Each structure stands twice: as structure tokens, then as C-alpha cells.
A protein has these predicted regions:
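Glycine-biased, small-residue-rich flexible motifs in mid-sequence functional cores and linkers
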Residues: 1-113
Length: 113
């Protein structure tokens, strides 16, 4: 895990964060995804979705990854998980926005993602 304290100058380099009032950014993985002008799409949905909806979320994640689109979500169970699993299975890049530090993954079942 890396901890990055952003200066005002550094914040300008993170094009995806412009206008956000952030002092600390905790990350694991490729932080440059926040700097690149790539396509990013939020892939979210119901937590208690049925099997068909989960299959479709997984398929959407895969299609987005294959097109070079970065997927973003909140790492929740259900559609968020299915979409991330589809994107990762296709070799895609993903961003998970979490309300807590990286030392406490919630929900725990998504620790491997």
C-alpha cells in the first residue's frame, strides 16, 4: 500500500481528481489511471441481484475491458463484484473507490479483487 499526500501542484496532475477536496489518497496498484485521459465508466448495480443480472454485469465488465475502458465502482457485493470480475477476467483495468483504508477491505469477500 502506498500513501500519497497531495500538494496543490500534484493535484493538478491527477486530471480525474480536479475540483475534489482531497488531502490524502490511499492506493494500491496503478495510480496513473487517475492521470491518463482514458475512458472510465462506472459499473454499478444492485447488491441483491438475481443470477441473470449478475451474468449481465459480468458480461458488461468483460466488454468494457476488451474495449480498453477502465471500470470504476464501489466494490460492493452483487453487480459491482460481478462487473469487476468480468473486467479483471478480460485483463481490464479497474478502479475501486472505497470508504475506508486499504487495510480494511469491505466487504471482506472482495479482498482478492
Amino acid at each position: 500500500m502506498e500513501i500519497k499526500r497531495l500538494t496543490k501542484e500534484e493535484l493538478q496532475d491527477f486530471t480525474r481528481l480536479k475540483g475534489c477536496k482531497i488531502e490524502n489518497l490511499y492506493y494500491r496498484g496503478d495510480i496513473s489511471l487517475l492521470q491518463k485521459p482514458e475512458k472510465i465508466i462506472a459499473l454499478i448495480g444492485r447488491r441483491n441481484a438475481d443470477a441473470d443480472v449478475l451474468r449481465n454485469a459480468n458480461r458488461c465488465g468483460k466488454i468494457l475491458a476488451e474495449s480498453g475502458t477502465v471500470t470504476l465502482n464501489g466494490l460492493a457485493v452483487g453487480c459491482d463484484t460481478a462487473g469487476l470480475e468480468g473486467a479483471l477476467a478480460a485483463g481490464g483495468k479497474c478502479i475501486a473507490v472505497m470508504p475506508c483504508g486499504l487495510d480494511y477491505i469491505y466487504p471482506k469477500c472482495n479482498d482478492s479483487l
